[in-house]
Amino acid sequence: MISSHPEIELAGFIEQTCLKPTATADDVRQMCWEAQRYRFAAVCVAPVYAPLAVELLHKQKPQVFTVVGFPLGLATAPCKLFEAQEAAARGVTGLEVMVNLGAIKSGHYNAIYEELGQIVDAVGCEVRAILELNLLDATERRHVAEVCLDVGVTALKTSAGWSGPVRPEDILGLRRILRNQLGIKVAGGIHTLNQALELLAAGANRLGTGRGVEILREQHALGKTA
């Protein structure tokens, strides 16, 4: 969590993202170039482009994340485990695993624990859990956050990007549950400097967006750099 004061260098909080279904290899190359140029914290790409991103960013500062069970989380646990192991073997820094929202809605939290636990135990890289925060009520958010605290993931990601942006107050509530034990990555609908600053002030650690360059340019144009 950071101060709401705008005079911070945002690049270290941004994970430049390219998960659109029409993404091409050239799109990924451009994104990785931007990530190096602007010193973003990481990139996040679809599994098919993970090897390319790893190759392009080898020994560079930006980390490489890819997704598992994306975007709905409805693959079987063995399928997700295989996908996770394959991605880890290709050298990514970390995985973002879409959880089964139906299991949450049904109160089957043991299934979430077992699915994530198998992946955490099987791979030697960082594992994050993707929720759709806007589709979960307060009780569901608390229960699934507690599962994630217990199972060994390193962070929660608020959305796969299809249920709309979250509000700063949502992040404040999630941060109260997690305290400082897990990271929070906000994704979906982050387009402006003010949005980025508000979410970070509320307790987010990372921002997943395809508009990182535009946000930094907005910051620099306003003279809001460190």
Curated annotation (Swiss-Prot):
Molecular-function GO terms, alphabetical: deoxyribose-phosphate aldolase activity
Keyword Transcription: no
Species lineage: Bacteria, Bacillati, Cyanobacteriota, Cyanophyceae, Gloeobacterales
Role of this protein: Catalyzes a reversible aldol reaction between acetaldehyde and D-glyceraldehyde 3-phosphate to generate 2-deoxy-D-ribose 5-phosphate.
UniProt protein name: Deoxyribose-phosphate aldolase
UniProt enzyme class: lyase
GO cellular component, one term: cytoplasm
Catalytic activity: 2-deoxy-D-ribose 5-phosphate = D-glyceraldehyde 3-phosphate + acetaldehyde
Assigned keywords, A-Z: Cytoplasm, Lyase, Schiff base
Family to which the UniProt record says this protein belongs: Belongs to the DeoC/FbaB aldolase family. DeoC type 1 subfamily.
GO BP of this protein: 2-deoxyribose 1-phosphate catabolic process; carbohydrate catabolic process; deoxyribonucleotide catabolic process
Annotated pathway: Carbohydrate degradation; 2-deoxy-D-ribose 1-phosphate degradation; D-glyceraldehyde 3-phosphate and acetaldehyde from 2-deoxy-alpha-D-ribose 1-phosphate: step 2/2
Subcellular location: Cytoplasm
Native source species: Gloeobacter violaceus (strain ATCC 29082 / PCC 7421)
Principal subcellular localization: cytoplasm
InterPro entries, per database record: Aldolase_TIM, DeoC, DeoC/FbaB/LacD_aldolase, DeoC_typeI
Enzyme Commission number, as recorded: 4.1.2.4
Active site (UniProt): E96 (proton donor/acceptor), K157 (schiff-base intermediate with acetaldehyde), K185 (proton donor/acceptor)
